[in-house]
Amino acid sequence: MSVEFDQLIKSHLQTGGVYFYNTTDSVRAERTGCETFGYGYRVMNHVMVSDRAFQLDTERWRRVLSGYTIDGIKMFPAETTEGKEKFDRIVALPSALDDKTTPRGALKLESCDSLLRRTPPATLITDDNMGTEWRWPLLGRE
């Protein structure tokens, strides 16, 4: 992930297309995605970003997730308490949008606008500075 890679992804997306990726909890990676694309959300330790503002369709999300399978195994089996609780928690994410009382590590949805206001300015990740790939192992910091 870097400004240059985000720009490459943007060039392959249709206008309004959405890119979703893992930021490994790096605030610099989150800010890089939000600043490069301009619109989006942090979803736990991922960002979902676009060149256009977009709204989350919770009913569509509910329908898609209820049928979601991996290798034929239902990810949210409604017949188990655990599956139902997981499903309800994830489907409820949009209701907690930008909720300042939710701890950072919790299941959370935050708009890019909120993220950029909440976090201190940081050097964006580029192909030349490699972000945490170089800083963390060598310096122990982001």
For each feature predicted by the language model, list its residue ranges:
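A short glycine-rich, Lys/Arg-flanked "PGG" loop and its adjoining helix->strand segment in the class I
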Residues: M1-T15
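Soluble small-group transferase modules, centered on the S-adenosyl donor enzyme superfamily
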Residues: Y39-E142
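Conserved beta-strand signature within the Rossmann-like core of class I S-adenosyl-L-methionine
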Residues: G16-T23
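Short, glycine/acidic-rich beta->alpha junctions
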Residues: M1, T24-D25, Y41
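Extended hydrophobic-aromatic, low-complexity segments
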Residues: Y21, E30, D57-E59
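Short hydrophobic alpha-helical module
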Residues: T15, T36-Y39
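Short alpha-helix
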Residues: T23-T36
